[in-house]
From Swiss-Prot:
PANTHER family: DNA-DIRECTED RNA POLYMERASE SUBUNIT OMEGA. This is DNA-directed RNA polymerase subunit omega. It comes from the Bacteria. The lineage of its organism: Bacteria, Pseudomonadati, Pseudomonadota, Gammaproteobacteria, Alteromonadales. SMART domains: RNA_pol_Rpb6. InterPro entries: DNA-dir_RNA_pol_omega, Pol_omega/Rpo6/RPB6, RPB6/omega-like_sf. Pfam families: RNA_pol_Rpb6. NCBIfam families: rpoZ (TIGR00690). GO terms for cellular component: DNA-directed RNA polymerase complex.
Length: 92
């Protein structure tokens, strides 16, 4: 079992409340959305992985926001391409 102290993660984020929000968002990305961990998993749960990523400075609120914006852009581009393909199929 990995021993994670949150003091290092709190120092990276600034305060414990924001750290909790960032850790929860990142853990959800790993567990539910299938995002790849940026550190070795070592059979840890997503929450522990998220805390380790925060401790190492790999994840913060800004990186999560940027990743989310990129995901939205990619999803919108895929939707536009699908609509364009449907429209081309109907116009023939």
């Amino acid at each position: 079992m990995a021993r994670v102290t949150v003091e290092d993660a709190v120092e990276q984020i600034g305060n414990r409340f924001d750290m909790i929000l960032v850790a929860a968002r990142r853990a959800r990305q790993i567990a539910v959305q299938g995002k790849d961990p940026m550190v070795e998993e070592m059979n840890d749960k997503p929450t522990v992985i998220a805390l380790r990523e925060i401790e190492l400075g790999l994840v913060n609120a800004h990186t999560l926001d940027a990743d989310e914006r990129q995901s939205v852009r990619e999803r919108e581009a895929a939707e536009i391409a699908a609509v364009a393909a449907i429209a081309e199929g109907r116009s023939l």
